[in-house]
Amino acid sequence: MIDRKQFFKKVFNALLAMTGIQSLSAFKGFSESLPIQSYTMPVLFVGHGSPMNGIEDNAFSQHWSSIAKDIPQPTAVLVISAHWYTKGTLITAMEHPKTIHDFGGFPPALYQVQYPAPGFPSLAKETASMIHSTNVQLDHEWGLDHGTWTIIRHMYPDASIPVLQLSIDYSKAPSFHYALAKELMQLRNKGVLIIGSGNMVHNLGMVAWDKLNEPSYGYDWALEMNNAFKELILKKEHDSLIHYERLGKAGQLAIPTPEHYLPLLYSLGLQDKIDPVAFFNDTVVGGSLTMTSVKIG
């Protein structure tokens, strides 16, 4: 007669040995890895603009809310934000990421906002293990910066969907970021919504503050580059977008520093050959910032 208890114990121990997992709690985390879904999740690049968009009911935030209704409910959200710019690549791996108010000079109401979405430590570990081009560190200090929560709180206001952030390694070339994104492709098949959050055209030093309320007011170079970026995206000419330094004087004005542009390369790196592209919030603000956003898939 086979002792059922001993039999299942042997099977369990064999599974631990096969997977290299050392404990029951670790096995639980392993078993909770997201399954493959019957659909492929779209990818977004979102122009996040001013932190005030996080609390305002305007055309931008309304589009964020509506696009969430047009895509499947995600199992988790992974954001590559312009505002987590680090030496090395990190991913948030805490149970409860804090809401970070990483800005100054705004109304008190903005600093009072909390977005208490859960983290997803086991998914953070799984994501880190997918990336072979660099060592990804599990981070327990950061949280959700305004490049993330100002958008997500309009998309998923009940804060019930787990949210993670992946940092941007400032020591790496644009081609590195584009290639790293491709290593995350499997997440799309697991229902994870990946969002690059920045701005294609982002020159704060040239903002026309007196024109902020003038719809679509833009400098000639900003309008030129907004159109050029869209055309290159539609033609899938990703190499030209990776090597943006070749885009002339207008390109230099549009991207004086790379941190708000690089999230776009993550979104484009995740584009499959058959993925359609659609633009939304396609407008210029204050002359030198574009809110132009992209839905891929």
Can you say where each PLM-predicted feature lies in the sequence?
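N-terminal secretory signal peptides and thylakoid transit peptides that target proteins
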Residues: 1-22, 29-30
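A short aromatic-anchored loop/beta-hairpin motif
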Residues: 33-135
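Beta-strand elements within well-structured catalytic alpha/beta cores of enzymes
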Residues: 42-47, 76-81, 166, 187-200, ...
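Long, well-ordered alpha-helical scaffolding segments within enzyme catalytic domains
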Residues: 63-70, 175-190
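Flexible, glycine/proline-enriched loop segments at strand-loop-helix junctions
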Residues: 110-118, 140, 167-174, 251
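Internal, conserved structured core segments that host functional sites
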Residues: 123-178, 183
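Surface-exposed, charge/polar-rich loops and edge strands
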Residues: 161-162, 172, 186-193, 200-297
